[in-house]
Amino acid sequence: MKLLPEKKNLTVVVNDIRNAVWLEDHTDFNVYILGGLVRRGYHYTTLPTRNEFLGMINIDKGFFSCNGFSVERGITAPDFETAKSVREILDVCCASYLMSDSSKLGTVTFAQIADLGYVNGLIVDTEIEKEDFDSIVAMTDIILAE
């Protein structure tokens, strides 16, 4: 996110309250926050009212994170509500990118968001093992972040 202030004329949609505040403080973007229930301790919204909003928009490029991902089980979240919420956002993205550090590779949590091949790319640190890189690049593009 820290590279975003270099961009101009963006409209950003987030469900994370802290990200919305950071974007408000550091950019001149139009920032929309998806409404709904604030998940206690995690500072993001989920469920009811945002569904209507999501049905009305198209997101050019969506960036999201997860609790774990693997070639076999895909992208996962700690609970069903979070997985469903992220999947609904992905469904309105023209292109979507998973941002994760390599330490989450091989971690599988409770609920699947999507298969790795469902996203257009994985943005990951350079610590990813070559064997893992080769397995994942067969499913989706990989962008190495320094």
Question: What is the role of each PLM region?
Answer:
Residues I17-E146:
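Conserved phosphate- and dinucleotide-binding cores of soluble alpha/beta proteins
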Residues E6-V12, V119-G121:
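Short active-site oxyanion
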Residues L3-K8, L23, T27:
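Active-site catalytic pocket residues across diverse enzymes, especially alpha/beta-hydrolases
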